[in-house]
Amino acid sequence: MQFTRTKIEDVIIIEPKVHGDHRGYFVETFRADKLEEFLGYKLNFGQDNESKSSKGVLRGLHYQLAPHAQTKLVRVISGRVLDVAVDIRRNSPTFGQHVAVELTADNKKQLLVPRGFAHGFVVLEDDTIFAYKVDNYYS
């Protein structure tokens, strides 16, 4: 897995290694040990969510405040989206700035969106399936 800090260093792009041949492919989509080693702290993802959307749908921007704040690890299972994270931490030097990343079923990129960020995406293909790991329960 490759981890890349974005212009907002707390937002991380994760690119898993894809092992493929004529039969298809295999990919580890999540490795807690590798992510925690990169971050320097432990995350406890306790819930997985999935949504299916049509082209043109805009989901977000959503955010949760304490005690319901969430770190999200998001990826596309089929289709593609333009995914956006906006820093809404008032005392942050990057307050109000955003990161936008195209996530697709083909590129397998994932985005780690920490607590204190608004998150959303616009769907770029019909029948896009989007998956979220979160470290706090939906409320």
Short names for language-model regions:
Residues M1-D106, E125-D127, V134-S139:
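Non-catalytic, conserved peripheral segments adjacent to functional cores
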Residues L103-E125:
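Conserved metal-binding segment of the jelly-roll/cupin
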